[in-house]
Amino acid sequence: MIKEIQGLRAIAIIMVLVVHGLVIVPPNWQDYVIKLQRLFFTPTGVEIFFVLAGYFLIYSLERFLKESAEKGIGKIETLLMFLVKKFKRLAPNVYFWASIIFIFGLLSKNQYPWQDSIIETKKFLSTIMFLRNFTETMDVSWFGVYWAVSLELQVFILFSIIYVFLGKRVSICLSLFFIFLMTFFRFGGADYVYLFRFDSILYGVIIFYLLQHVSQSKLKEIFRVSIFWKTIISLSLVIILSGVLRVFSEYPNLNISISAMIASIMVLLAISGNGYFYIDLKYINKSIDWIASRSYSIYCSHMFSWFLVKEVYSYFSFTEGCGSFILGIVIMAIFSEISYRYIENYLK
C-alpha cells in the first residue's frame, strides 16, 4: 500500500470524526465547534474514501478478471466471486455494529435519539440489506452513518456488472456521463443529494484509466516540488475540501462535484509518491498508519462508542466535559482496535 494513500485515509476519517464531533465535545466547546462548522464542514472526507474506492475498484476488478481468464473461469462466476469478496470485506463490521446499535436502541426505552421499536427495526433491516441511503430520508437515527457503506456496495455491484458484460469502453463512457450529469442534477432531491453522491467513486475510476498512460516515474517527476510547497499545497487542499460545502452551499449539486474534484486531485498527488500526505517521522508515521488501517472500523464504531459514553454519563448523572470527551476517544480507539482485529477481517 502506498504510504500516502494511508495518509489520505487518515485525513478522511479524521474529517468524518470532526463533522460528527458535536456528539462528544464538551458542552462549553459546542458553540465554538458550531461557529467553525459554519465555514469548515467536513463530511467531504467521505469524498476521499469514495475516490479511493473507485480507484481500487477498477484496479482490483481488472486484475481479478485477468487472473480468472488465465484459469479459464467464466464471466458470471468471476463476477460472483469478485462481489462476494467485496461483501465479505464490508459486511462483518456493518452487521456487528448495526446489531449492537439495534439492541442498544431497544433497551433505551425509546428515549431520544432512539426511535420506537418499529422504526429502529426498519433502520436495522435497511442497514444489513445495504440500502441504508434509501431510508435515511424518512427518520434520522444512529444507523445513519451506514449510508456511505450501502452506496459503495451498490455502486460496486452495478459497475462490476456493466464492466464485465458491456466492457471497459461502455463503463468509462457511463462514468463520464454521470460525472457530467451530477454536476447539475442529483438523485434524492435538494435535501438528500449527499446520500447518492456516487460520482465521487466514478472519479476514482477515471483517475485509474488516466494513469494507465503515465508511468509512475513520470508522474512523480510531474508533481515533484520542494517540502515547503508540498506543505502549502497539501494543507490548502484539505482546507479547501473542508470549506467547499459551505462556500458553495447555494449549489447543492455543484458543491459535491467540486469536492469530488478536489479529492481526486489529492488522490492523484498521493499516488505520485512525492510525500504530500504522509509524514514519515517516528511515532507520527505509526499513528497515521494505525488510524488509516483502522479507518473502516473507526467509521463503523465511532458513533456507538460516543453514544455509549453519553448514556453512561446520563445514567449516573455525571456532568459531561473534558473527561467524557477523552473517554469517548479512548472507547472509540478500543472498539476500533477490537473491531479491526476480530471482526473486520473475520470472513476474509
Regions found by a protein language model. Name each.
Residues 16, 201, 206, 229-345:
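Alpha-helical transmembrane segments of multi-pass integral membrane proteins
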Residues 14-22, 103, 177-187, 235-246, ...:
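Aromatic-anchored segments of alpha-helical transmembrane domains
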Residues 3-66, 91-94, 131, 200-201, ...:
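Functionally critical transmembrane alpha-helices in membrane proteins and complexes, commonly lining
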Residues 57-66, 104-108, 162-168, 206-216, ...:
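Structural signal for the C-terminal ends of transmembrane alpha-helices
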